[in-house]
Amino acid sequence: MSWDDEAINGSMGNDDAVLMDSWDAEIGDDEPVMQSWDAEEEEKKPAPKPKKEQPKKVKKGKESSADRALLDIDTLDEKTRKELIKKAEMESDLNNAADLFAGLGVAEEHPRARALQKEQEEQALKRPAFTKDTPIETHPLFNAETKREYQDLRKALTAAITPMNKKSPLNYSSSLAIDLIRDVAKPMSIESIRQTVATLNVLIKDKEREERQARLARVRGGTATGGAGKKKVKGKTNLGGAFKKDQDFDLDGPDDFEFGDDDFM
């Protein structure tokens, strides 16, 4: 007799009945058994397609900075555009070099700062553009305090002013030099003014001598000490004292050497 027949005929004990009940309960809780193995499997539902991200709409009048820069550079001429591109490439190279130096631990100055410093030095070496409104007293030479500094100022002023005489001697003397000497001498003491006058008198004598020598050099036969065109006096012939003026014969005077007829006898 099999184990199933005992369960049907009731010959199974209580313990065995309880075991059967629990086994049936476990079977009942399982999923239902398919009636046919040939049943087709349910078609799997297709996975939902991912939604495409829609580009964000940009409000009118609010363009991105890159688009705005692109539009600005497109409006420039070819030369300016090339200069801007070259400048941008240079800045990019400098930044890359700075990052490389920083990664290598090289403690050096930033290339951009070095380039800026070099540009500033070149600008400082360039000659400043002075205008008529530029105050001349702002020049460092006018901060003179020592004797040497005053001499340097005098030499600089002399070198800058005296060439103007070639442009217009009349205006140089009447409108500049004479009035300038007077104005400069005003704050001076009387003794200092006298020294200035004495210096000018010496200058006058030197100029007179130079003009006289130049005039005599232009005249043929002139001398530096004599007058212009003065003829030279020829010297007398030296006879060695044989004849003197007081020993000349007087033909009109009495005849001291009269000879009588008897002298030739």
UniProtKB/Swiss-Prot annotation:
Keywords, in A-Z order: Cytoplasm, Initiation factor, Methylation, Phosphoprotein, Protein biosynthesis
InterPro entries: eIF3-like_dom_sf (IPR023194), eIF3j (IPR013906)
Subcellular location: Cytoplasm
Effect of disrupting the coding gene: Marked reduction in binding of the eIF-3 core complex to 40S ribosomes.
Highest rank taxon of the organism: Eukaryota
Gene Ontology biological process: cytoplasmic translation; formation of cytoplasmic translation initiation complex; maturation of SSU-rRNA from tricistronic rRNA transcript (SSU-rRNA, 5.8S rRNA, LSU-rRNA); nuclear-transcribed mRNA catabolic process, nonsense-mediated decay
Keyword Cytoplasm belongs to the record: yes
Predominant cellular place of this UniProt entry's protein: cytoplasm
Any one GO cellular component localisation term in the record: eukaryotic translation initiation factor 3 complex
Pfam families, alphabetized: eIF3_subunit (PF08597)
GO molecular function: translation initiation factor activity
Start-end of Basic and acidic residues biased regions: 42-71
Record-listed Omega-N-methylarginine modification sites: R220
Modification Phosphothreonine occurs at: T75
Record text on subunit structure and interactions: Probable component of the eukaryotic translation initiation factor 3 (eIF-3) complex. Is not part of the eIF-3 core complex, with which it is associated in substochiometric amounts.
PANTHER family from the UniProt entry: EUKARYOTIC TRANSLATION INITIATION FACTOR 3 SUBUNIT J
Function: Component of the eukaryotic translation initiation factor 3 (eIF-3) complex, which is involved in protein synthesis of a specialized repertoire of mRNAs and, together with other initiation factors, stimulates binding of mRNA and methionyl-tRNAi to the 40S ribosome. The eIF-3 complex specifically targets and initiates translation of a subset of mRNAs involved in cell proliferation.
Additional information: Present with 17900 molecules/cell in log phase SD medium.
Name assigned to this protein: Eukaryotic translation initiation factor 3 subunit J
Naturally occurring in which organism (per UniProt): Saccharomyces cerevisiae (strain ATCC 204508 / S288c) (Baker's yeast)
Gene field: HCR1
